Amino acid sequence: MSDYLIRPAEDRDLEALSAFSRRTFVETFVDGFGIPYPADDLEAFFQKSFSSEALCPRIHDSECVFWIAEREGQIIALCHAGPNDLPHEDAKAGEMELRRLYVGKEAQGLGLGTELLKRALDWMEAHTTGALWIGVWSGNLKAQKLYQAYGFQKVGGYGYPVGEWIDQEFILRRA
């Protein structure tokens, strides 16, 4: 039995969700992968992507799902999925994308990332008859391997802006 709760994100979660997103991004990409983002770029990205003002419309978007996992009142993971926004020539209206799946360092190894991925895939499949899409950083081999195990294949790439810094992302698709 798990010692965490997965539920939809709510307004009351915005401040904690913002802090969790920032912390997890830094732990994963700066500390974990050693990406040397300039401080100004990182802060611009955080404001655009993880501020309460940026997150609020995402948790209320009726075309999306935004779950959090919490343990003892603390957010330990998040999952966001909705209509595909990835820049790929074969993408069609109505197809779905896993937009973000973050698991905090303290919750890794619990199977939570896989559980959230399965929930997201079920939700996406229920909301489209088309392909499912994921954008993943080109250096995150562990995530790529996980997504490949669920039938996703690399079909392209694009530049993902973190402020002025551009990360190289792979586009994965499951038809």
What is the meaning of each model-derived region?
Residues 4, 8-12, 16-106, 117-119, ...:
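Acetyl-CoA-dependent GNAT
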Residues 110, 127-130:
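Short coil/turn segments at alpha/beta junctions that flank glycine-rich nucleotide-binding fingerprints
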Residues 109-122, 145-149:
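Conserved acetyl-CoA-binding loop-helix of GNAT-fold acetyltransferases
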Residues 92-96, 130-175:
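C-terminal "cap" of GNAT-fold acetyltransferases
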Residues 104-106, 110, 138-139:
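Active-site acidic-Proline motif in GNAT/NAT acetyltransferases
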Residues 1:
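Short, conserved catalytic or adaptor-binding loops enriched in Gly and charged residues
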Residues 73, 77, 111-113, 151:
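Conserved phosphate-binding and hydrolysis motifs of nucleotide-dependent enzymes
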